[in-house]
Amino acid sequence: MGGTTDFVLSITIVLVILIIIAYIWYNFTGWSPFKYSKGNTVTFKTPDDSSIAYMRFKNCVFTFTDPKGSLHSIDVTNVLNNMAKGFRDAQNPPSSFTLGGHCQAPLNAFSFILPGVNDRATVATADDAKKWENCDATLTGLQRII
């Protein structure tokens, strides 16, 4: 083979190896599990006070029971990632954010909405809302700083 072909082949092999290493690094290292239960204030904080905009989430599931005892789950990975990314253009991005905003609402069956189950139209009255007070809720997943 010619010198140019050998060079191109070498560069291609090196690039493929670098892509494989980057894929392994991103997908299999540095992820920390989290779990919040009903009544917990859900706060995500960067360990080194860097911008929360660099936090990423994966495999995040919000699970709750309804008053009838049925179990419901929602994948909220994109919601949490978009909340963190929303701080990217902030003048002074914070190093943490709390689910529920300034209210710092504790985790409950209404922290994330599943249409037709725990939305405003389905839970229409105060009596309906009271039935939900004792329903369990959990938020689990993985987080990391990129």
UniProtKB/Swiss-Prot annotation:
**Where is the protein found, in the record's own terms?**
Host membrane; Virion
Outline the inducing conditions: Expressed in the late phase of the viral replicative cycle.
Membrane disposition = Single-pass membrane protein
Q: Which UniProt keywords apply?
A: Host membrane, Membrane, Transmembrane, Transmembrane helix, Virion
Where primarily located? host cell
Q: What transmembrane ranges does the database entry give?
A: 7-27
Q: Which GO terms describe its cellular component?
A: host cell membrane; membrane; virion component
UniProt lists the family membership as follows: Belongs to the asfivirus E146L family.
Write the protein's name. Uncharacterized protein E146L
Q: Which organism is it from?
A: African swine fever virus (isolate Pig/Kenya/KEN-50/1950) (ASFV)
Taxonomic path: Viruses, Varidnaviria, Bamfordvirae, Nucleocytoviricota, Pokkesviricetes
